[in-house]
A protein has these predicted regions:
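Proteolytic cleavage junctions
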Residues: 1-11, 107-233
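Proteolytic processing hotspots in large secreted/extracellular or virion-associated proteins
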Residues: 9-151
């Protein structure tokens, strides 16, 4: 339990006596193959580079419980090169995704339910991180489609998708931080949300069959005329 006057520190979940990264790091280094170490972030958001490096290449999973139904999962063998100290803070809802124009979001979401999400860190992680976010139990069984906003193209790009579990939770894979939109749908959406919205449009039938038919008919007439000429010539000879 946090005492008055103490600085806020993360701690190993279910063992609040082990708090602070200087204590947590040795626990990660000593973890056995297949172990999962869950850290309650306790209001903090930044994880030092040396802590992430402590599980690099190992069969160890670090879970960061951010609170409010949000948690990060980092698998040691997925770490290629930690970029540095990383701020894993996540903003969801109305205060998130402010760099994404409303018309860009609407063009992809249409009538679908959606939620904006912003990561505090800017740039590549140097590893794959899986975020668990709650999309409400009413959406259980549906798919949460993650779209990244590309500021250069000013478009939303499909990143990944996950099926929402009975409790409303879904796991989504991230490799870098930015502004995102999560779109709930009955299926996994394509990498072009705009194209998906046009699925019901009628596509004009090709005119190939019509032109081919005319070509075939013209050939038939030529053959018939040729046969008639041959019969006339043969009749004249005999």
């Amino acid at each position: 339990m946090q005492r008055k006057g103490d600085s806020i520190k993360p701690y190993i979940k279910d063992d609040s006596g082990k708090e602070g990264w200087d204590v947590i790091k040795p626990q990660l280094e000593e973890a056995k193959a297949g172990d999962t170490v869950t850290v309650a972030m306790n209001g903090t958001t930044v994880v030092p580079k040396d802590v992430i490096d402590s599980i690099k290449g190992k069969d160890t999973t670090l879970v960061l419980d951010m609170g409010n139904g949000l948690s990060w999962k980092i698998y040691g063998k997925d770490i290629t090169d930690a970029a540095g100290d990383i701020d894993f803070d996540v903003t969801v809802g109305a205060d998130a995704g402010k760099s994404i124009p409303v018309d860009v979001i609407n063009n992809v979401t249409g009538e679908r339910s959606s939620m904006n999400l912003t990561l505090a860190y800017d740039g590549e992680f140097g590893f794959t991180a899986t975020l668990t976010v709650n999309m409400e139990s009413k959406n259980a069984g549906l798919y949460a489609n993650l779209f990244y906003y590309n500021e250069q193209t000013e478009e939303l790009e499909f990143i990944s998708a996950g099926q929402i579990d009975p409790d409303g939770n879904v796991e989504l894979v991230f490799t870098h931080a930015s502004d995102y939109t999560i779109v709930v749908d009955t299926k996994i959406m394509s990498d072009n949300g705009q194209a998906d919205n046009k699925a019901d449009e009628t596509i004009p039938a090709s005119k190939t069959d019509d032109s081919t038919s005319k070509y075939t008919w013209n050939n038939t007439i030529i053959i018939i005329i040729g046969i008639c000429i041959m019969l006339i010539v043969i009749g004249a000879i005999f």
